[in-house]
Regions:
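A short, well-structured alpha-helix characteristic of acyl/acetyltransferase catalytic modules
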Residues: 7-19, 141-155, 261-263
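Active-site rim helix/loop that mediates acceptor-substrate recognition in acyltransferases
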Residues: 10, 15-61, 155-180
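Conserved beta-strand in the GNAT
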Residues: 43, 48-58, 66-73, 183-199
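Amide-forming acyltransferase catalytic core, primarily the GNAT-like/NAT-type
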Residues: 45, 114-199
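Conserved acetyl-CoA-binding loop-helix of GNAT-fold acetyltransferases
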Residues: 74-91, 101, 114, 208-220
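Conserved GNAT acetyl-CoA-binding A-motif
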Residues: 90-104, 223-233
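Conserved catalytic-core motifs of GNAT/GCN5-like acyltransferases
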Residues: 102, 118-133, 245-257
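C-terminal functional modules
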Residues: 233, 237, 241-272
Length: 272
């Protein structure tokens, strides 16, 4: 039986999620209660036990309402496929024109493709040497969740958008894992430092030079850094022609299909 989660299901949902995904109780609670909302959590019940779970997080893309399928886990591909069908059908009834997802594994990608999802939101990954430049100035960790939503809207409006409240959960998770946000009037970047390398998981700027200045400012802050690995949207206007293309997300249209060839999706709490 497929249904919405009830408060009494919490212990079973937590145990299933942790067994399948290995996240902390704090992370799971944040995902269920604050990122999706309990009213958007779907479960598959069999013989009085919760066997699968999936979250439907409200999002928008190009001004259209939709949902982000998150946290899909459970036993049995048929059960999971049925849960995906149920979630998508219910979201369509609620007015969603599409459902997006970030597959957690090749098997999940295949399952979603079988359910009508298609690949979208490809990324480009590129290494860059970072020059020393004492004159490159920027601010650090001054961007709020609300501001991050506004910056995404400004620099790449064709982005799968979360509300500021949902983005606050994502930002909290990023900070807990050691992320730093560098920003200026011309752009911003979110990065992790590992040894002598900066890994930018999101970088948006007016042009290549503005992006380079952000990286240079980050290098001055982190001192021993010499290079960066940047991940941007495949269609993003930075360092065009550079980098290796990577698959990332998927989309299923619940209404009239629309063009998502230049659309961007990233930082969807999927690395918890």
């Amino acid at each position: 039986m497929y249904r919405l989660m009830q408060p009494s299901d919490w212990a079973e949902v937590l145990a299933l999620w942790q067994a399948q995904r290995g996240d902390t109780e704090e992370f799971v609670r944040g995902a269920v209660e604050r990122f999706a909302g309990v009213q958007n959590v779907y479960v598959a019940e069999e013989n009085d036990h919760i066997e699968a779970v999936a979250l439907a997080v409200p999002v928008t893309l190009q001004g259209r309402p939709g949902s982000y399928l998150f946290g899909l886990c459970g036993q049995g591909s048929l059960l999971l496929a049925g849960l995906v069908d149920t979630l998508c059908a219910q979201q369509k009834l609620r007015g969603a024109g599409f459902v997006v997802a970030v597959p957690a594994s090749p098997e999940q990608s295949t399952l979603l493709q079988d359910k009508g999802f298609q690949k979208a939101f490809a990324l480009r990954c590129l290494p860059r040497e970072v020059e020393r430049n004492l004159w490159s100035q920027a601010e650090f960790d001054s961007v709020t969740a609300k501001k991050l939503c506004e910056l995404r809207e400004r620099f790449w409006p064709d982005t799968v958008m979360l509300t500021p409240e949902k983005m606050a959960v994502v930002l909290g998770d990023l900070y807990s894992r050691g992320a730093t946000i560098v920003s200026s009037e011309q752009g911003y970047g979110i990065y992790f430092r590992k040894e002598d390398t900066l890994y930018f998981v999101e970088l948006m700027a007016e042009d290549d030079r503005s992006a380079e200045k952000l990286m240079e400012a980050a290098r001055e802050k982190e001192v021993i850094v010499e290079k960066a690995v940047i991940t941007v949207g495949a269609a993003q206007n930075l360092f065009l022609g550079e980098g290796t293309r990577q698959d990332y997300g998927m989309i299923r249209f619940e209404g009239e299909p629309f063009d998502v060839s230049e659309s961007y999706m990233r930082l969807m709490l999927e690395n918890g």
